[in-house]
Amino acid sequence: MIRTINAGLNWLILLTPRWLPVFVLIPVLYLIGWSKAQLLTLVGLPTSAVSLVGTVFSFLLFLLLMPRWIRLRWLIKRPWVALGLRGMEAHQPSSFAVLLRGLLWSVLLLALIVLPLLLGHWAQFQRTDSVRLLLDAFVLLFGIGLAEEILFRGWLWQELNSLLGAKAGVISQAAIFSLVHARFNMGVWPMLGLLSGLFLLGLVLALRRRLDHGSLWGCVGLHGGLISGWFLLEKNALQLSADAPAWLIGPGGSNPNPMGGLVAIGALTLLLWIQRTAFNKSLFTKTEHRNAS
């Protein structure tokens, strides 16, 4: 039985053409996870929770499969290093330091949205202490933030680099990231704004990983910090006015996404330029050291 399962997994991973397993993997895992969640309804799982539980099952299966996938397809013996969850070199900053740096960038980006809201009297501070909200924010940070970064900047980006090349790979992962998170039930211009902001965020996160020497934790801090930070602000710390401008808080009506606002788009564009300048400078420094030695 185990030998049959192993053979089936190897067959899936090594399917040809080479791009086919990439497009087949997630639907197959989601179908398996959804099926397992459906079975739990027989023992009392609410039908409203099937999608969430199925997604959790699917991601756990994804993590279990990754070591085999990386060894067979990427020919790398250290899967968690390849995904960016463990450092490649001893002299690199700790994962906690890299995570903290990403969190600080998320705080700065959110501040660029919150300060104009307060100064323009489109929002005011409120405080409703809630342990449940803090726990939810923690889950968003280390649940959604970590899971999505493993999926997009850990696994998908590497696969797209292998299939399309480095330049097309980084653009493609950002495009897929934006499309997956877009809402298509809004007008054309709000949707384009949201797609643009999410695309820029995908590029920023990819370059963040490059600057962090392959570590994924800076991406987790930045991405998860934006999600959990905006959640706490919107649900707990800020009372938004009904006339708060969409160019500031983003499209979405009563459930806005600030990444689609002009302020976030401008800030992400600036951050992308800063990161790219820093990355080019680090490459130049490495080249000089190599030539000197």
Where are the regions a protein language model picked out?
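Functionally important transmembrane alpha-helices
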Residues: S35, G193-G250
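Small-polar-interrupted transmembrane alpha-helices in polytopic inner-membrane proteins
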Residues: L110-I113, A137, L141, G145, ...
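Aromatic-anchored segments of alpha-helical transmembrane domains
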Residues: I26-W34, L110-P116, A174-R183, G224-N236
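N-terminal membrane topogenic signal
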Residues: M1, I5-F23
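Alpha-helical transmembrane segments in multi-pass membrane proteins
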Residues: L15-L75, F96-G102, L135-D136, P256-G266
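C-terminal membrane module of polytopic membrane proteins
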Residues: G224-S293
